[in-house]
Amino acid sequence: YQYMYNALQHNNGNGSFSNISQYTGMAATDWSWSTLLADFDNDGHKDVYITNGLLYDIRNTDADKQVAQYVSDFANDWVAKHPNAGDVKLFDILDIDKTIALLPSVPLKKYAYKNNGSMQFSKVSEDWGLDHASFSNGAAYADLDLDGDIDLVVNNINSPLEILENTQDPITHNFVGLQLVPTQDIPNTSGAKVTLFAGQQVWYKELSATRGYASASSQNIHFGIGKNTAVDSIAIIYPIGGKQTIKNVSINTYQEISALINSRIAPTKTDKNNTIGENSLHPEKIFNRFFTIITP
């Protein structure tokens, strides 16, 4: 039997990955839906927020047995009372609400982990006021009040959504906010790779709204830069192959950056001898997917 646990894949930088979920203490977070990685305290490290909640616990084996027994008893009783009814679909006569009510429905707490650097994380759900129980699935982040820290919007099943304001007081760390504005040359900025340089530190992000479960977050790019009071430069690489370099970057504010190309990036050459060619042949394994012959 294999116990399920989360996977957190660390990019080793050499084409391989290592699962460090146990090492970071984030291997077990109940039934998890959205996992958001963002710098919620602007210290320069991405933190982790996880929504939780399963409206009906269909994994509960005891409840599964109760449901099976209830359905069997119901069907037998109905047939006894309607002997001449003919063929009837079970779902046309079964009390679905009563059946589902046999399944456990317990709200679960959400999880939040602070990134302390060097792949060390601390569970801060309670400290950050994010540990209340609910049936939550989708979640998105954005700086809704433009005060420099990232807020959360969480979808809850059968109850109103939550808008969770980040109330850092005072804000002890600095940030850089960017909004890439499409232009005629670059009508779509999605997929842009943004690298920020400040002193000896480097931050990297890719512009993609899709995050979490069935959710989309803000298209603004937000960097927490900790105690840094200045930024050397920002380099942006667009999917079409152009590069844009930005100097004189302001901190603790959001800047609109018109997507432009300062220089072109030469396409990467591929050795055709290392690719799959016309001589490659896939041998199909013959297998009958519908019938299996069992030999006594």
Where are these regions (language model features)?
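Beta-propeller blade termini
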Residues: 10, 33-42, 137-144, 296
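Beta-propeller blade signature
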Residues: 4-12, 111-115
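Short, conserved, GDST-rich strand-edge loop motifs in beta-rich repeat architectures
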Residues: 1, 54-104
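Secondary-structure transition into beta-strands, especially the periplasmic turns and strand N-termini
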Residues: 12-16, 39-46, 116-120, 144-148
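Residue-level marker for isolated small/hydroxyl-bearing positions within beta-strands
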Residues: 11, 49-53, 153-155
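Gly/Ser/Thr/Pro-enriched helix-cap/hinge segments flanking short amphipathic alpha-helices
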Residues: 102-109, 115, 120-136, 140, ...
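Outer-membrane beta-barrel proteins
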Residues: 23-28
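Intrinsically disordered, compositionally biased low-complexity regions
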Residues: 15, 40, 53, 63-67, ...
